[in-house]
């Protein structure tokens, strides 16, 4: 059976599956990196199946110990504003919306947060005494 896009249903199914696998791969990477860096502080992360719909959690990665909601996108082309709207709506009240995206793993993933949240993180870093480490060029913050 041919579809209007010129592909067969089997090809379309394979492409959809491939896209989902790329998304899952980024979600697993995010969770693993959070666990590697913050696990010693009692923070744990795990990829949520079906974006957490089953557990009542919204977001792609659940982080226990931090008030964040992470939306992950691993796509060649991305509509930042559309993805950001999704991240914010899933975060709800009391959680920092975080959008992590990658261009099919061609580059390191990038992260989008609200500017006010960035200022809050800077303020917390200063209060915790991490600023001297930043000035020395050491990467000790998240």
Q: Where do the model's predicted regions map?
A:
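Catalytic phosphate/metal-binding cores of nucleic-acid and nucleotide-processing enzymes, i.e., regions
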Residues: 1-142
């Amino acid at each position: 059976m041919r579809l209007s896009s010129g592909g067969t249903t089997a090809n379309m199914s394979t492409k959809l599956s491939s896209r989902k696998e790329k998304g899952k791969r980024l979600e697993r990477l995010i969770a693993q990196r959070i666990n590697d860096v913050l696990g010693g502080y009692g923070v744990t992360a795990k990829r949520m199946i079906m974006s957490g719909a089953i557990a009542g959690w919204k977001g792609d990665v659940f982080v226990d110990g931090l008030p964040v909601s992470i939306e992950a996108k691993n796509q060649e082309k991305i509509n930042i504003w559309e993805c950001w709207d999704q991240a914010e709506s899933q975060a709800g009240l009391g959680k920092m919306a975080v959008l992590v995206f990658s261009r099919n793993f061609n580059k390191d993933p990038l992260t989008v947060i609200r500017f006010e949240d960035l200022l809050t993180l800077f303020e917390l870093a200063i209060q915790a005494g991490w600023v001297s480490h930043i000035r020395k060029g050491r990467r000790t913050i998240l």
